[in-house]
C-alpha cells in the first residue's frame, strides 16, 4: 500500500548557485525550464540559463530518429482537450493503435518532453527525439499495441524549485477523459518523460499515487524528501553520470531508499553498448527481483564521437534518447500491471 505523505516542498537545493524561481525566465516568460532548457534548432535542444551552456544536441545523423519522424510522427493526431474545471484547453498528440478494437483493452503511455519543447510548434513534442515516437513504431506496436499521448504544454509546468503549474492537473484530467472515450486499461497506464517531463512524472506519482502502473524517469530529479512513496512503486530511473543535476538527484533518492531499508537495484552501463548487451544488462538487473531500478550511464558515454562536453549542462540533453533506445526497459514497462 502506498504511503500517505506530507507534501512539503521547501528543501535545500541540490546544487549551489541555483537561481530563485522568481528570477528565472522560461521559454515563454513563465517558469524557467529545468536545467536551463531553451528551444533550439530542428531536432536539437539548446542549453541556456542556469545549467545551460549554449551546447546543441544535433540529431540529424540519427538515421533511426529521422525515419521515425518521417514514418511515425504523421500517425499521431493533434487534438484539443477542453477542461471543464478551468475553462482552459490543452493540445495533445495522440496515437491510436492501428486496427483499434473497442472490444479489446489497451495500455496507454504518456510521454512528456523537456522544457525546450515549450513554446515550439505542436509537432516538436514528437520530432525532438525518441521519447514520444518510439512507442508508436510498427515494431513496438506489434509487441505492445498501445495508445500514446503527448501533451503540448504552453508553459513550463515544473521548475527546479519544485513549483508546478495548473496545466499538470489538466493533463491528468485529459488522461481520465481518454480512458472514458476509448477502451484503455486503467491498470496499465504508464508515464515517462525527460528532464521537465521526468520531473512532472515524479510529481504525478506523488500527487496521484494510484494512477500509473509504472514509470520511466529520464534525466530528471525531484524533491527527494517526499519521494519515499516510490519505495512501493515500479520504475526505471535513468540518468547520465555526466548530468550534474539529475545524477545528484538519483544518488539522493538511492540514499533515501537506503535509509528506509527499501530494496532497489542499481547498475552502471555504457550508453554506447549494443542492443544485445544492453538487453542482457536489463535482464540481469531485473533478475534481482526489485521493482525500483536505477541505471546510470557511464561518464562520457552519451557524448557523440569527438564531443568533449554537452555544454554547461554536461550530459543532460545528450542522455535522453539513449534511455528510450533500450528495448528491454520498454518491454519491462508494458509488463507492469497495477495491483
Feature map (PLM): residue ranges:
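Sec-dependent N-terminal signal peptides of Gram-positive bacterial secreted proteins and lipoproteins
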Residues: 3-22
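A domain-start/cap signature at the N-terminus of enzymes
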Residues: 23-108, 199, 265-272, 339
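C-terminal catalytic histidine-bearing segment of alpha/beta-hydrolase fold enzymes
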Residues: 52-53, 238, 242-245, 263-339
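Gly/Ser-rich "nucleophile elbow"/oxyanion-hole loop immediately N-terminal to the catalytic nucleophile
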Residues: 99-100, 104, 158-195
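Active-site machinery of serine-nucleophile hydrolases
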Residues: 108, 112-172
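Cell-envelope and extracellular/periplasmic
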Residues: 112-119, 179-182, 194, 201-206, ...
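Primarily recognizes the serine-hydrolase "nucleophile elbow" in alpha/beta-hydrolase
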Residues: 180-181, 187-231
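Catalytic His-Asp charge-relay segment
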Residues: 232-241, 254
